[in-house]
Amino acid sequence: MNFIYHKWKYIIAAFLSTLLLIWGVNVISIENKHKYIPAPLLGQEVDFNQDIRPIFNKKCIACHGGVKQSGGFSLLFEEDALSVNESGERAIVPGSIRKSELINRINHTNPEFRMPSEGEPLDKKEIALLTKWINQGAKWKDHWAYIPPQPQQVPDISDPWIHNDIDKFIFAKLNKEKLLPNPKSDRYTLLRRVSLDLTGLPPTLEEMEAFLGDDSDLAFEKVVDSLLASPAFGERWAAMWMDMARYADSKGYEADRPRSIWKYRDWLITAFNDNLPFDQFITMQLAGDLLPNPSEEQLIATAFHRNTMNNDEGGTDNEEYRTVALIDRVNTTWSVLQGTTMECVQCHSHPYDPIRHENFYQSMAFFNQSADADIPSESPTLVDFEEEEDKQKLGRIKNWVADHPGKNDSVYYEKLIRITEPKLHPHYFEQMDKGLPVRGTATFKVTDSVYSFTKQVPLMGEDRLMLRYRADTSVGTLQIRLDSKDGKIIGSLPVNRKTKTEYNKEEKKDKIYTINETVSFLVEPAVGTRDIYLVLEGSAKAKTECVIEWVMFHHALPGQEASGFGGISTDFYDILNSTNEKITTPIMLDFSDGYRRKTNVFEKGSWMSHGDEVEPGVPAKWNPFTPTMESNRLGLAHWLTDPKNPLTARVTVNRFWEQLFGLGIVETMEDFGSQGFAPTHPELLDWLALQFVHDHKWDIKKLLKQLVMSATYQQSSHISDELNALDPRNYLLARGPRTRLTSEQVRDQALAVSGLLSPKMYGPSVMPEQPDGIWQVVYSGDKWKTSSGEDKYRRALY
């Protein structure tokens, strides 16, 4: 008993002593509030972005940021930092260091209580800055990149070296650093530099002789204008964009099967050569299909986000890999257009920047209504018919619909024929075998013991059902039923190995007699949201099954009573099942409202663990997503190209600057966040961004001409030992650029100077010569077939 008493006596005494020590230390540190503030800091205004945020990011954010919020305290968002944490205290109380727990903790001498709890403690200057910042009201500022570009006064400076306003910004900073820029490059070097930069190709001997022989003041400008007008210009800049669009002529993953998407590459070349304004360039790629009456070019542009990988391996979960593609689209959009690292937000709030976990899934909601899925056919695709026979059939069908008005116009039927857009993929169906679920993959089977169904299908009075199936023999009749497996039959299809659709004039209806597995047959029109069941009434054979790839409802062709309808009907089904040569390009299309998916937050980033449902939206620190913007990809495109967006123009001009100067004004081109590099010339960056949007009207060629006409670009790249020691990375731009050619440019240059380079543009991708064994895939069996003739010597982007 005495032992217990003495034990508690010492514990209580130690506890009271500790409390006194803590209270005493805190009182001392608070009473002498300027104790750690060096004299030079006492009078200065503390700047959050310059002085405070770097301390938080370096010493605090690992435990009190987007990934972890120890003690319920986060420094990522102002509202969180100033709120009450789990202890009931406020870590930061503006204007009061006495009430700010943060000041107590960073001054504490006891390691158990001092913050940061791990690593080196804050030094005296850091403590002084935090103390003074809170004393001055703890004024929080948004990171510079999230504030829209601000109008800048061009430096009032003159010098014979200066060519345009860009040079005034550069010269002013050099002047401040007591440096002088280099003189102009020699004409040979300058021509080679600008030719490689603007077209990716070296100048020809004729171009070199013409430039060297032109002594006029406009000689260089004439060269620049000629290069901007060259077809090679579009090829050079399309190659740059293809890297950001993750372009490939194959699908990726283990099989890495071929993909026909070269029409998107050709669209890029044309867009750059035609100088499509950048805001339209972005809008068409993100949402060309959602524009009013989209053109073929606008549809092909959407292949930007069909460059995601596709897993053709058997046994994979289609929804899982569809989700992987969605995540890739979110990350690519934010990286390419906003210079923002979004990948980590899939699992948690951003570690350093004001982007919450749910913001990732709000972004994903913009893309979640797309009709594509992880299936081998890569539908939806845009079909281009190569054979004149098929083109004529399509023309006759369009003319027929125009001459016989019905529920839908010719655009509807052209889309039905040219765009493989099945609404109901296998993964929308559930299969039941004797009351037990059967897991589907890329296709699903309907047998005499299995039925399949999908719920909540919006029907709008369509009177035909189209589906694609495979059957090895005559297997019975496929019934389409409403609401249950024993529900009302609205249509039926005899499933045969080989059939063909023909129009029976006497019965005024189609016979089912289709070849090549795509069939369309009459169904009783229904309206509303219904459950659809596919039930096979099989034959007596032991193996009775029909493998279905997709299902869709549509409206019949108009004018069934008119003379000649039989021929048009035959044309319609012939072209749907044509085996003639055709080109298919994967494109983006959204489901109609009735098929819309819900989007949920993935808990810890797992696609199988759904949290709260979210609607399309953007992070709060960016420009607002206004009510006039549609809650789809088109609305996202309008938000990104809104002049109020703080990043789109900055990121874009920075990217083009980097291509010419070798280093961006912001060196971390894909990270404009607080962990990225600050701009070397922030005023110039904002000035260029505002010029690009308001003065140039998003004109890429005008921007590039402005850059290459500057003395900054044209100066010699010679570097002295002194300058190399002072500025080895050329941040100050006291010399001209020294940039490496890309591997593709090295190859193109070698072919060009040897006289072998083919000027042929556009068309399917080619396979130039390469050593045996380089191109190998695991199990697809695809072979590298070396192209012949001039196709072996085309530019690398082909």
Residue ranges and their predicted role:
Residues 2-15:
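N-terminal Sec-pathway targeting helices
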Residues 259-283, 302-305, 311, 331-342, ...:
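Non-catalytic accessory/assembly modules
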Residues 12-17, 22-26, 219-356, 363-364, ...:
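Extended surface/linker regions that mediate inter-domain or inter-protein docking
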Residues 395-578:
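Extracytoplasmic
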Residues 7-8, 25-131, 138-166, 171-172, ...:
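Solvent-exposed helix-loop boundary motif
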Residues 48, 118-140, 378-410, 538-540:
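C-terminal capping alpha-helices of c-type cytochrome domains
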Residues 158-193, 197-232, 246-292, 353-354, ...:
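Primarily short, surface-exposed interaction patches in extracytoplasmic proteins
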Residues 115-116, 223, 227, 250, ...:
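Glycine- and acidic
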